[in-house]
């Protein structure tokens, strides 16, 4: 089954809690204006993920924290794309971001941490050995967007590592 968006969002005014599957937070509020689903990959992070996301808004500042898992957009590893690498790690992907918003301007940044265990055993000359391997990557993004009735100007930069789960 391919699930696009299915979530529960509890909104208390200045804060909200989202539980379910929706856009990966790296996708963000600054993305290309498009006519079809060509989202700009491999330059724009694109993917949906099961997640628990908390947002707090105060005085034009929005803080986002999320813990994510992988379902259909997967990390690549020794056995190809699979969700077993994040299952082996027992640690979700984490995201933290801050945005400053006005009626027509957004500027912000975010950090994503992903820790995977690509394999738990290795076979050498017919012998199976237990291995202890972990890869932890930190990725960052900054973005800015200005909109008016006549203009839409946006810029985003991603410095990423091991971001196959968001089509990069």
Where do the model's predicted regions map?
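Outer membrane beta-barrel
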Residues: 1-73, 90-91, 95-103, 146-149, ...
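Outer-membrane beta-barrel translocator domains and adjoining extracellular loop/strand segments
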Residues: 29-37, 70-90, 114-132, 165-168
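Outer-membrane beta-barrel transmembrane strands
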Residues: 54, 68, 87, 133, ...
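Detector for outer-membrane/organellar transmembrane beta-barrel domains
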Residues: 102-168
